C-alpha cells in the first residue's frame, strides 16, 4: 500500500507541474491573441478603404474593366493556398481546414493535374507530403504577428502563377477568427477578382480625370490588391491560431485540475485504507497478547 501511495503522490506532483506549464502557455496565447486581434482590426480598416478605392476605379467607366485579373476563364486547374500552423497544441485548428480541403479535392477533381497546392505552415505541408499530395510551394516559420514581408514570397507566387495561367482560379483555405472560442473554416475564392458584392452606390471617382488611363492603373493596382486580400486572410488565420492555442491550453489546464482532484480523492482513500489496516493489525496483535 505504501508504494501505491507514493505512486499516487508522484502522479499528483507531475500533473501539478503540467498544469502550471499549460496555464502559463494559456496566458502567453492570450497575450498573443490580444495583439493579433488589434493587428487584424487595423488591417481590416485598411482593407476596406483599399477595396472601396479599387471598386470605384473599376466602376468609374461605363465600359467594364478588361484586366486579366478580373476575367473569368475556363477552369482547367484550381489553385489552393492552404494556411495552417507550424506547431501543434492548437486543438482542432489544423485538422478542420485540412479535412475541408481534402474533401473538396476529392469532390471536385479527378486527378492531380486539375489542382495545385501552396502550403503556408509546416503542419499543412507535412500533412500533404504524408499523403503523397504534390505541393508546389511551401512557406514555414511565420512569426506570431506576421508582416507582409514575411509572406510576400508565397503571396506573390500565388498571384504570379495565376497571371501566368498555371491555374485558372485561386482559393485561400484558412480558419476565420470569430471569437476566442469559435473559428470558421473558410475556402474563399480570391482570383479572379470579383466586386459583385460591392454596394450599389455611385462611384466617387467618375468625376475625376485619371492619369495615366484607368487600364494602366488597374494593371498595377489589381495584383497588389489581390496580394493584400490574401495577406488579410493570413492575418485572420493567425488570430484564429492564437485563439485555438489559448482554448486548447485552457482545456488542458482544466483537465489537469480534474485529474489532480481525482488523484487526491484516490490518495485519501488509499491512505485511509492503509491506516485502517494498521489499526486492525494493532488491535489483532493486542488481542493475541
From Swiss-Prot:
It is found in: Cell membrane. One of its GO terms (cellular component) is proton-transporting ATP synthase complex. The keyword Transport applies. One of its GO terms (biological process) is proton motive force-driven plasma membrane ATP synthesis. Keywords: ATP synthesis, Cell membrane, CF(1), Hydrogen ion transport, Ion transport, Membrane, Transport. It is a peripheral membrane protein. InterPro entries: ATP_synth_F1_ATPase_gsu, ATP_synth_F1_gsu, ATP_synth_F1_gsu_CS. The keyword Cell membrane applies. One of its GO terms (molecular function) is proton-transporting ATP synthase activity, rotational mechanism. SUPFAM superfamilies: ATP synthase (F1-ATPase), gamma subunit. Belongs to the ATPase gamma chain family. PANTHER family: ATP SYNTHASE GAMMA CHAIN (PTHR11693), ATP SYNTHASE SUBUNIT GAMMA, MITOCHONDRIAL (PTHR11693:SF22). F-type ATPases have 2 components, CF(1) - the catalytic core - and CF(0) - the membrane proton channel. CF(1) has five subunits: alpha(3), beta(3), gamma(1), delta(1), epsilon(1). CF(0) has three main subunits: a, b and c. Produces ATP from ADP in the presence of a proton gradient across the membrane. The gamma chain is believed to be important in regulating ATPase activity and the flow of protons through the CF(0) complex. This is ATP synthase gamma chain.
Amino acid at each position: 500500500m505504501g508504494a501505491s501511495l507514493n505512486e499516487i503522490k508522484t502522479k499528483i506532483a507531475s500533473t501539478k507541474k503540467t498544469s502550471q506549464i499549460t496555464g502559463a502557455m494559456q496566458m502567453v496565447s492570450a497575450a498573443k491573441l490580444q495583439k493579433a486581434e488589434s493587428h487584424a482590426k487595423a488591417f481590416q480598416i485598411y482593407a476596406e478603404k483599399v477595396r472601396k478605392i479599387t471598386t470605384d476605379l473599376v466602376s468609374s467607366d461605363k465600359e467594364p474593366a478588361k484586366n486579366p485579373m478580373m476575367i473569368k476563364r475556363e477552369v482547367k486547374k484550381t489553385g489552393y493556398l492552404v494556411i495552417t500552423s507550424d506547431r501543434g497544441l492548437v486543438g482542432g485548428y489544423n485538422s478542420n481546414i485540412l479535412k475541408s480541403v481534402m474533401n473538396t479535392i476529392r469532390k471536385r477533381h479527378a486527378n492531380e493535374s486539375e489542382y495545385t497546392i501552396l502550403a503556408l505552415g509546416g503542419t499543412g505541408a507535412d500533412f500533404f507530403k504524408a499523403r503523397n499530395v504534390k505541393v508546389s510551394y511551401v512557406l514555414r516559420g511565420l512569426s506570431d504577428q506576421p508582416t507582409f514581408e514575411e509572406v510576400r514570397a508565397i503571396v506573390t507566387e500565388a498571384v504570379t502563377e495565376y497571371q501566368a495561367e498555371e491555374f485558372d482560379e485561386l482559393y485561400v483555405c484558412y480558419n476565420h477568427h470569430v471569437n476566442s472560442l469559435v473559428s470558421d473554416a473558410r475556402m474563399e475564392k480570391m482570383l479572379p477578382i470579383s466586386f459583385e458584392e460591392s454596394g450599389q452606390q455611385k462611384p466617387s471617382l467618375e468625376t475625376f480625370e485619371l492619369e495615366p488611363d484607368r487600364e494602366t492603373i488597374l494593371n498595377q493596382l489589381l495584383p497588389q490588391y489581390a496580394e493584400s486580400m490574401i495577406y488579410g486572410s493570413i492575418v485572420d488565420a493567425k488570430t484564429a491560431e492564437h485563439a485555438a492555442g489559448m482554448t486548447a491550453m485552457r482545456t488542458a489546464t482544466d483537465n489537469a485540475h480534474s485529474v489532480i482532484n481525482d488523484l487526491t480523492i484516490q490518495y485519501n482513500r488509499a491512505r485511509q485504507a492503509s491506516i485502517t489496516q494498521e489499526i486492525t493489525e494493532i488491535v489483532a496483535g493486542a488481542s493475541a497478547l
